[in-house]
Amino acid sequence: MKVVRTLVMTVMVGWPGIAGAQSLLVPMDRTQHNHLKAYGLTYWTLEQYSGAEWLLNYRGGSFLLPDMEGVRRQAALRGITIEPVSAADLAQIRAVIADANMETVVLEKAPNVAIYTPPNSTPWDDAVTMALEYAEIPYETIWDDAVLDGKLE
């Protein structure tokens, strides 16, 4: 019985994902299959769960999201590469960031996004709206009247 218990513990510690990740790393380096959608996943996570981290200069500016079933589901649906991160992995990531030209930015809530564009434009008329549409990041459009009338907040 003691041998079985030791074997189970060894497998759980040695196999990432079984012991349970605390966070999900969304890499933004060449391992990421869908960079724009990854930004959208981070935005969605901030809307749903409020809280994420942007790891500046770490693997292309990766994101650290909470390991929630909804986040995993959205990543799978959107074709986004994610990596489970254990507490030990997270400590190692933080050590790498502390020792290099890197920084962690805490993201607390999803921002309001507005695009300055003519009212009759379509999303494919410019790169910004097309990128936001593809990433599934909600935005409002504003044009001259809103600016001149002082309707911006």
Residue ranges and their predicted role:
Residues M1-R5:
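Positively charged n-region of N-terminal signal peptides that target proteins for export
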Residues S23-L24, D29, H33, L64-R73, ...:
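Helical hinge/lid and interdomain linker segments adjacent to catalytic or ligand-binding clefts
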Residues K37-Q74:
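N-terminal, post-signal-peptide region of Sec/Tat-exported proteins
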Residues V71-E83:
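Short amphipathic alpha-helices in soluble, non-transmembrane regions
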Residues T81-A110:
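Non-catalytic propeptide/linker segments at domain boundaries
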